[in-house]
Amino acid sequence: MKERLYELKRQALEQIGQARDLKALNDVRVAYLGKKGPITEVLRGMGALPPEERPKIGALANEVREAIQQALEAKQAKLEQEEVERKLAAEAIDVTLPGRPVSLGNPHPLTRVIEEIEDLFIGMGYTVAEGPEVETDYYNFEALNLPKGHPARDMQDSFYITEEILLRTHTSPMQARTMEKHRGRGPVKIICPGKVYRRDTDDATHSHQFTQIEGLVVDRNIRMSDLKGTLREFARKLFGEGRDIRFRPSFFPFTEPSVEVDVSCFRCEGRGCGVCKGTGWIEILGAGMVHPNVLEMAGFDSKTYTGFAFGMGPERIAMLKYGIDDIRHFYQNDLRFLRQFLRV
């Protein structure tokens, strides 16, 4: 029995050494250590041996099995390492080959305009305020002097979630929230960019989701002339030197007086063209002096503090700057459109 075990060990180690791949190695493992292998047969036949020989033969059988197992593991590790080296050699990179150019992403034209507007006002000392897109009825309407029953609160114009919760219809709620945080003490000087939602039918000039940038300044002795000077500077930096603006009377519930703001046409220099519809002026935003009711509801004394506010649609400004005739282009992810705005 001893001789047989020694011979099995010799044969197994020889075949392990000759194995050229993992499959051949596994065949050796099954042949010698499997349930039907010779080592297992020896252990099963221990009962036929004289009692005094069983411990010695059992110990030898376990020793042989352990030696074969260790040889199998060592050979497997060697074969796996050789396989890794073969793959590395096959996949070697030729460092002398020219590199492939990396395609860089570019800002979306709308994002570019929003960032440009933000940078202009930050340069004037404004800070950027942010707020929730899912807003309460109070901040979206009441705090902005839009009482119950006002047409702008109609269910047909807003996306209501509950009777008191809706998707904000403008970024003005951020102004009300910011003024509240100041607890009646100025100055306040912010811009509020963000997405807004209205129940509009999507067409060339309307979208159910779009962006707004609103601005607010509250302090002592703020006048209409401050508003005009700010917006004239904004127009000149955004549309080019030589631009002028004009105010036209209008109405917004949260400002009094309220104005529509036009900029002199940057296409025809005021001579009249298709962009300005022959008038020499292009409407770009709405503005006005903050209504005393809005100041009071936010905790400011309207006899001590005054302020101005303005709001614009970056989509409209981007359409004017780049000659885009359909707002839907901004949201369709058409690469033919977007690639026209690649930065060099």
UniProtKB/Swiss-Prot annotation:
Q: Which GO terms describe its molecular function?
A: ATP binding; catalytic activity, acting on a protein; magnesium ion binding; phenylalanine-tRNA ligase activity; transferase activity; tRNA binding
**Mind listing the UniProt keywords for this protein, alphabetically?**
Aminoacyl-tRNA synthetase, ATP-binding, Cytoplasm, Ligase, Magnesium, Metal-binding, Nucleotide-binding, Protein biosynthesis
Q: What is its EC number?
A: 6.1.1.20
Q: Which reaction does it catalyse?
A: tRNA(Phe) + L-phenylalanine + ATP = L-phenylalanyl-tRNA(Phe) + AMP + diphosphate + H(+)
- Cofactor list: Mg(2+)
User: Which superkingdom?
Assistant: Bacteria
Q: What cellular component GO annotations does this protein have?
A: cytoplasm
Q: What class of enzyme is it?
A: ligase
Where does the protein principally reside?
cytoplasm
Identify the residues that bind Mg(2+): 256
**A GO BP annotation:** phenylalanyl-tRNA aminoacylation
| Coiled-coil regions, chain positions | none
PANTHER family according to UniProt: PHENYLALANINE--TRNA LIGASE, MITOCHONDRIAL (PTHR11538:SF41), PHENYLALANYL-TRNA SYNTHETASE (PTHR11538)
Subunit structure comment from the entry: Tetramer of two alpha and two beta subunits.
**Family assignment from sequence similarity:** Belongs to the class-II aminoacyl-tRNA synthetase family. Phe-tRNA synthetase alpha subunit type 1 subfamily.
Q: What is this protein called?
A: Phenylalanine--tRNA ligase alpha subunit
